Every structure is written in structure tokens, then in C-alpha cells.
């Protein structure tokens, strides 16, 4: 028993063959563990046994690295396409196939439709077209040549129904997803403008407040699933769900996107008259329905005249959809102009504003535009009406509204809001061919924020020509919280007047050349 005991004693008394250099060794700990106390050594092991020291060293080396967060795959930058692939992609894209129809071309899918897309069209498109009253023949047979917009209806109508369904691989494809979102981005402003024009002509004495309530009651997001079900389209939007049993957050967003996109496609292919037909005939909307009436409010007595065509009877949607201006009409939209500018405005001809301020305003805005009229008297009459419309645009409600409710810019402001929304939406669609609808909607909202609209008017120093009531003149001129919203309203009223008198091209000219909404023109130093 002697030698083993001596060996053990020698082992414990001799120094260890390696040293730890604990003072000079730097150990980098990347994270702190919850419990760093090492497990207790067995009682039979002495404090400086090699096995214990090795175990402690191994534990100290075991540093817990923090969990790395990798970016999602959609944010990882891809290498740019080489020239050949980029050229091939652009040449095969349907978006660049139509030179004569740039807006419609920008809403076509960015890549040719796949076999899965064609399968869906073969199975369900006939049902959708029948529900809205369209011929069942393929749209490629309509018209002659690619310049006929109706020939592309099948593709756009297919995209309108492809709301993003996480369980469907087909709706997650980029060309389908972006094509659908671009259509609903356009369709929402088409609907707003359609109802705006309809209600302004149907209710010639009403202020815009009740009209907005009527529009919300007809196409608010809560009622859109009901309209889809009324037209028997709910089975195409929700093929596997019962619409009545779905909760709101699952039912309303897809219904809203599909409803808007349908009207985006119809507007691109058939124009605004077809939008009215589908709204009131296929979906069965009734503006006289009890649920669509505005809340009761104190009405100001309107003693002023309205145009003769509004006095006889209340206009229907067929009157608005079928209306074509006569060949020698003064304006691009004569009936809309007469619905917004009351005949009594002629009493303001020759007043101080007409003599002093109107020429400066017209010079700043580039009015009157050169027109090729057959008779010089038509040009003269148009310029007189344009001057009265401009005076109405600058007429603040505080001046005459209490005695004469329509002698202010409110109705022109309402139509101006809607037309500037649509013009900016069309501009963004043609400018950003690859952008999805959500990105376009955000850019649209940021560009047309109310505070910017008024700022562009103030940049041209036109705010000095606004006609306020005597009681509020000082308050508005020295308080920007009151003044700036009124300059925004005047800006939008100018767009409404430009649309009524000269049409949509003049709204584009005002927005992008005169007021430079996109802020791309060089500024004077």
C-alpha cells in the first residue's frame, strides 16, 4: 500500500506543468448567461485538481453568442440584371406594348400571364362578366387593333379579383399582386369623382357636406361586401368562406380592394359612363334609399336661381352618363360648370375685384388659354364666365354664404379635390411602372397633403386675392391657423374650375407646370 500513497503525495506537492496566467489572459464574453455559477465539484476532488481546472477552463471558453437577426428575404438586395436580361424583360412586358394608351398600358401586368392565371380566367371570368352584364365573348375580339382599350378588359378584369390570399401561390406572384393593387389604387379615385359629379348635378342647391355623407353611405367599406353579394360576386372573392359568417377584418379589406379594382378596370377600358351603369344597374345602388340620406341639419335658405336644366326635374344617373356636350359648348363640362357656378354670379361683373385682382390672377395662372372657336363671341363668353368662376374660387364662405349659400368656393372645391386626386393617381401610375399600389397610395397622400396644396398657392402670392367677410378679415390675415386651410380650399377650387372649363389637361397643367406639385422645377434664388 506504500507506493500508491507516495505517488499521490508527490502528485499533490509538485507544481502543475502549465499555468493559467489569469491576470494576462483576456476572455471576451459576448453575452451574459442567466446563471454563471459553475456546478459544484464532487467532494472527493481537491480544490486544485487538474480535472476540475480543465472543466472550469472549458466552461469559461464556452461564450454564448447573441442571436443574429437576419434581414427578411425581401430586403436583401439582389444583383442588378445584366443588360440582356433587362432588355428581354422590358420587351416581353405587356406594360410597354401600347404607345397610344399610356395609362391603360401602365396598369397591365408587368409580365405575361402564366398558365395558372389562364386557368382561373377560363373557369371564373365568364361568371364575373355575366354578373356585371358584359358580353361573354373574349375581349380580344372587340374593336380593331391594340389601340382599342376594350380589348384588354379580360386581363384587367382578371387582375381586379386577385386580392392577396396567403394560401394561394397564384395571387402572391409579383405581376398579379402589383397589377391588382395598382388597379384598386386608381379605382378608389374614379369612384369618388363619379359620385362627386353625379351628386353635384343631382342636388344643385346642396352643400358638399351632405353629399360626402351620401357617398360614404353608398361606398363606405362597411357596405362594400353587401354590394358584392348583391351582384353575386362574393363567391369569386371568398370561394371557401361564408361571407355572412366572416369577421369584419377578414371580410372588409378584400371586398374593398376588389370593388375598387373592378372600377379601375372598367374606367380604363370603357370610361366613366360605364362606371355609372355598373354602379346603379349591376350593383343596384339607389341614391334615394333611406340608408343613404344625410343627417338632418339646419339649412340656409337658398333664394338664388339654379340653371334651367336643374329646375325642371332631378337628374338621374342615365342623364349624367349619357350627357354629351354640344359641339359649340363654351366649356369641356358645361353642365358641371353650371352646377357649381350659380347664374347669379353675373351680379359681380365689373366690381373692384373683377377690375383690380382678376387680371393679375389670370396672368399668374396663364389664362385665358388659346382656343380655336368658330365664332369670336364664344371665346368672349367663355372668358367672361372664366372670370366669374375665378372670382367664385376666391370667395370665402364668410363673405356671402349666410345670405347666399352657393356664393362661395365650396362646390368647386369639392370637384377640385376629386379631380386632383385622380390626376395625381394617373401621373404616379404612368411614372412608376414597377411600384405596387400601397407604395403609390403613400406617395399620393404625401404629395397632396392639404398643407402643401395651400403652400403652392402662397408661393405664387395668390392668397392676397381671397375675399373674406369684413368681420373676419383681420383674424384670417394675421392667423395662419385660420388662413392656411382657406388657401388650400382656394387651390382645390381652382383645379375644379379648370376641370369644368378646359377639362383634365388643364388640371395637369396647373398642378405640374404652374404650381409644380411634384417640386421638380428649379426654384428662383
Curated annotation (Swiss-Prot):
Listed GO biological process terms: Group II intron splicing; mRNA processing; regulation of gene expression; ribosome biogenesis; RNA processing
SUPFAM superfamilies per the UniProt record, alphabetical: RNase III domain-like
Subcellular location per the Swiss-Prot or TrEMBL entry: Plastid, Chloroplast stroma
Annotated TM spans: none
CDD domains, per database record: RIBOc
Pfam assignment, any one: Ribonuclease_3
Domain annotation RNase III: ranges: 125-271, 403-503
Disruption phenotype: Pale green, albino, and albino stunted seedling phenotypes. Lack of plastid ribosomes.
Transit peptide interval: 1-28
GO CC annotation: chloroplast stroma; nucleus; ribonucleoprotein complex
UniProt xrefs under InterPro entries: RNase_III_dom, RNase_III_sf
GO molecular function, a single term: double-stranded RNA binding
Domain of life: Eukaryota
Keyword hit for Chloroplast: yes
Swiss-Prot/TrEMBL keywords: Chloroplast, mRNA processing, mRNA splicing, Plastid, Repeat, Ribonucleoprotein, RNA-binding, Transit peptide
Role summary: Binds specific group II introns in chloroplasts and facilitates their splicing. Acts on both subgroup IIA and subgroup IIB introns. The substrates of the subgroup II also require the CRM domain proteins CAF1 or CAF2. Binds both single-stranded and double-stranded RNA non-specifically, but lacks endonuclease activity. Required for plastid ribosome biogenesis.
Subunit record text: Interacts with RNA. Part of large ribonucleo-protein particles that contain CAF1 and/or CAF2.
Name of protein: Ribonuclease III domain-containing protein RNC1, chloroplastic
Organism: Zea mays
Phylogenetic placement of the source organism: Eukaryota, Viridiplantae, Streptophyta, Embryophyta, Tracheophyta
Gene (UniProt): RNC1
